[in-house]
Amino acid sequence: GDATFDQKILDAHKLHVAIKVTEELLYDNAFNLENYIIVQFGKALANAEEDAFLNGNGTGKPTGIFDGTGGGHLLNTLAAALKSDDMLDLVYGLKRPYRKNASFIMNDATLPSLRKLKDNNGAYIWQPAYQAGEPDRILGYKVETSAYAPKDGIAFGDYSYYNIGDRGNRSFKQLNELFAGNGMIGFVAKERVDGKLVLPEAVQIMKLKVD
């Protein structure tokens, strides 16, 4: 049947990171520390977003793709070690319209067992990229890895149905007074963001047996 969309309301959840540095280091003209801090804040916030968009439970944070209630549809939970047929089930368990733009998301720790899987003809189902910058593939579909993806799960789907709402720009603030008594300068970076999968059937989740 036709896809049905439930109303999803994006909220504004706060993500923030903070650090302290010595005044001497801050005012050392030989090193552009302030610019370095801003770059590091950007990386830290991006990591926090990635974690939240994959694992968040929707309480004070986005609802992640792997969340058990608001995330992708749980296709199956394996009781034995991963087999190539399980990957076929995951791919074809996703409805055809979503397979066109689908890809896998998994933890790096899942790769060793996946790369050893063979089909019934003895051929590896893992298809390595032959050009720099191109993704590896499984059964013809791109493989994306994340250090934040759970080690006991693989997602397969069209992630364009995951809506992200940014509530204003990232803000960076220098706190000159708060730690002045200790000879320190504080820096804080904040942003407000939310994310939800508006169509859970667009992403399938397979839970793995982890020793």
Predicted regions and their residues:
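Structured, hydrophobic secondary-structure cores that serve as assembly/anchoring elements
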Residues: G1-D211
